[in-house]
Amino acid sequence: MADNLAPRRKKMRLIAEARYERIPEFIDVRGHLIAQLLPKVRKSVPNWQAQEDKILFVDSEKQPADEFVIAFNRMSVILEDPHSVNEFADIARSKLRLAHEVIGKDIPTIARFGVRFISIFDAPEFHTHAQLTKHIAEATIRIPDAVPLKPTDSLVRLVHDQGVITIGPASQGEE
């Protein structure tokens, strides 16, 4: 699928996260995890830090763009400005698989798995809420012809340095 918003995107961060039941022995196995994982991930995320509730592997301590987190109740891969979504998917799959090989026996079930896309856009030509809402809906909402859905509403939540903007009516008539 073509990325219609790519020319306007200033930054993008993709996050893949698996959540699971807490591992009670996590504090006791952190050293083992680091010893097993560091040789395999050192090329992309050479810096690591063991904290009370997680182990953080990063490519840079000052401004990380590639992060790999293993915690007592979740593991995640965070990548900033990947070349493509496929590149991100390959990296996330690889790192999550490595972690699962080491601590998978302690995780009976993955309770939730999710992927988040966070983007920052440059859109100086939009001066009103209605203009921006219409543009976002037209540029991002694509429903395949085979799916018999006709959207009647949309909602986009944008968090910025001064607060939060919610774009789109929450229900019919709130336009």
Language model segments and positions:
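Short, conserved charged micro-motifs
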Residues: 23-29, 86-88, 126-128
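General N-terminal targeting signals
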Residues: 33, 87, 94, 132-134
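Hydrophobic, Leu/Ile/Phe/Ala-enriched alpha-helical segments that form helix-helix packing faces
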Residues: 33-45, 95-103, 140
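Short C-terminal domain-edge/linker segments immediately following a structured domain
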Residues: 45-51, 107-111, 145-151
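Aromatic- and glycine-enriched beta-alpha-beta binding-site module
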Residues: 78-122
